[in-house]
């Protein structure tokens, strides 16, 4: 396991090199990310799996979340996808994951009330890309998550935490555990990010290659 800690720019560079130069498709990386989060949830929180809610944004972090929901569903977990944001803005990878989830008839909703019955929440709204204050439906979702008292597993970064500074961008998810991909992130080690991340699990077997 590496102790390397990276910025958002470095992580984007590594992802881009892996996808565009080496040729590993982004969907492969997304599946590996989802497997890592699924494994952490199943192994670390087996008593919290009665009603899992995956809160998915419209970008690739949300695509990770939808893949996580599918993998939990296939493991026999009752899971609901809570969609946040505009589906018209969904990334291509997100759209692919959504199509697969529909095949498996995984329940989906946009009603925040579903969080009231959750026994575990997966935060998959924002990954490493946030650079402005969280507002609107995303802020409402974050505040609703924080008003629960259940286990929260953040995907890559707690939504609302700046990847480079660890600062809260208006509002941010308070996670029980953050599963971050390939390398630890600077924002998880400083300022509010240290507290909001909870326990940090670095999923370093991602197939992402660092070339500086």
Swiss-Prot record:
Pfam families associated with the record: YjeF_N
Residues where K(+) binds: 61, 123, 159
Domain (YjeF N-terminal): residue spans on this chain: 11-212
Signal peptide: none
Catalytic activity field: (6R)-NADHX = (6S)-NADHX; (6R)-NADPHX = (6S)-NADPHX
InterPro entries per the UniProt record, alphabetical: YjeF_N_dom, YjeF_N_dom_sf, YJEFN_prot_NAXE-like
Record EC number: 5.1.99.6
SUPFAM superfamilies for this protein: YjeF N-terminal domain-like
Cofactor: K(+)
Top-level taxon in the UniProt lineage: Bacteria
UniProt keyword terms in alphabetical order: Isomerase, Metal-binding, NAD, NADP, Nucleotide-binding, Potassium
NCBIfam families xref list: yjeF_nterm (TIGR00197)
Family statement: Belongs to the NnrE/AIBP family.
Protein name (record): NAD(P)H-hydrate epimerase
């Amino acid at each position: 396991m590496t102790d390397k800690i990276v910025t958002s720019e470095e992580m984007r560079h590594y992802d881009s090199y892996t996808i565009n130069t080496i040729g590993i498709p982004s969907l492969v990386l997304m599946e590996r990310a989802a497997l890592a989060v699924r494994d952490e949830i199943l192994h670390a929180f087996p008593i919290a799996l009665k009603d899992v809610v995956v809160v998915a944004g419209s970008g690739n972090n949300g695509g990770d979340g939808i893949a996580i929901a599918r993998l939990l569903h296939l493991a026999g977990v009752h899971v609901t996808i809570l969609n946040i944001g505009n589906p018209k803005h969904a990334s291509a990878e997100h759209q692919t994951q959504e199509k697969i989830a529909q095949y498996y008839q995984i329940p989906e909703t946009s009603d925040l009330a579903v969080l009231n019955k959750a026994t575990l929440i997966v935060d998959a709204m924002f990954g490493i890309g946030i650079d402005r204050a969280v507002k609107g439906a995303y802020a409402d979702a974050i505040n609703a998550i924080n008003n629960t008292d259940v286990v929260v597993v953040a995907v890559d970064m707690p939504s609302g935490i700046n990847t480079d500074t660890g600062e809260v961008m208006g509002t941010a998810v308070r996670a029980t555990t953050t599963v971050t991909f390939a390398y630890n992130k600077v924002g998880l080690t400083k300022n509010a990010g240290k507290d909001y991340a909870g326990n940090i699990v670095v999923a370093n077997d991602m197939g992402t290659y660092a070339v500086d």
